[in-house]
């Protein structure tokens, strides 16, 4: 085989590896019960996919939404996101373990979690009507040596999973949990940040009285936000400003 063909094949294989390595949330565990998510690399090609708690998406390349899509509906629950038909039941104050298929070590960045009340059955909600409040965010953990140790590194070390606690004070009801990784490996340049939003439907039981104010998905970020336009390969001693609204505090 000619050298040019070998190099071309190597490049294609490397590209395929990068795409396959992004991953997605394949399911969650609540109180020991497993709920399957939307398996985009399988169900998107099926005429009759099973009903799940996970939102469907057309992101079959396991790709991302960048700054050019921050004011489009794709940033809400990924590309062409549509509500799942089912919901996972979780007690207020309970934990949800979100299981990723995989995540590439090089894609350092924060992990963020939001809730938005559906005002009814989440399976029929208009995603553009959802208003999200942030319940958790973790970013740079150790910046002593660039590119630093990030929340994504903890996710990887925890068998590609992330556990989030549902605030005990929120009202019971139906919510969309928006779980997101922002890859910052190319974020030193405009529109280089890579957002990977993943949405699931949950039903919170036994909650309190809190009804936090929310933000529309298309207003969560700007492509010039300090935590979006950020060079992880420079001096990190100043820390990292996590983008989006402040974390809700009861």
Swiss-Prot record:
The signal peptide annotation in the UniProt record is: 1-21
Q: Where in the cell is it found?
A: Secreted
Disulphide bridges, residue numbers: 77-199, 118-122
Induction of this protein: by what?
A: Expression is up-regulated on steam-exploded bagasse as carbon source compared to glucose.
Q: Which GO molecular-function terms appear in the entry?
A: metal ion binding; monooxygenase activity
- Where, by residue number, does O2 bind? 185, 194
Q: Where does Cu(2+) bind?
A: 22, 107, 196
Gene3D superfamilies xref list: 2.70.50.70
Q: Which family does it belong to?
A: Belongs to the polysaccharide monooxygenase AA9 family.
> What is this protein's record name?
AA9 family lytic polysaccharide monooxygenase E
Tell me which species this is from.
Answer: Aspergillus tamarii
